[in-house]
Amino acid sequence: MTVGALLWVAVIQYFVVLLVVQSRWTTPYSWARNAISDLGAATCRYSDSVETWVCSPWHRTANVSWLLTGVCMALGALLLAKSFPASRTARIGVGLYVLAGLGMVVVVVNPEDVRAGPHVLGSLIAIIGGEAAMIILGVALLRAGYARGLGLLGVAGGTIAVIAMVLTLARVGGSAYFGLWERIAGFPVLIYVICCGLRLLFDRVRPRAARQ
């Protein structure tokens, strides 16, 4: 369990690297407008999708980070399967996190400016699969009466993320808000695995009576 939890906590590197790669841009980068995937684009170009210039000098660094994130999510979920409630609901949630991690790997090997079709498919699998995993795992935890805070976070955070994903796909606000909705849709998926990993690590050292 410890290795799986550490893998999930290691997902935090995603956010650190995101800021580092963003800081290397010489063209304007906006969290409201730019897609997350713009950081991993292999070429410099004008993006019709977000109506701005995209040029990421450290795109390889971003892609390595995303690859590690996908592997950590998927492998961590497999190793942590028995750490969650022994229910069909929990198993489905864990399985969806494996799928979401694999979706991130697909994103990495298919940069948005090289193979757009597979890239978009991988993004949808990673984000939508991860959102479903959050909600389903949250429900499983609430039903089992274990880690209620995590359960509520999964259901509430997942629901907000789903709404944001709908806004992303509907392109509400146009290009000016594409990046904002995408981040609200995708970031909770990663934040939740970090929180779950931390909780499981803390449970290794805390008395059982204090785990509610």
Regions of interest found by a model, annotated:
Residues M1-P28:
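N-terminal signal-anchor transmembrane alpha helix
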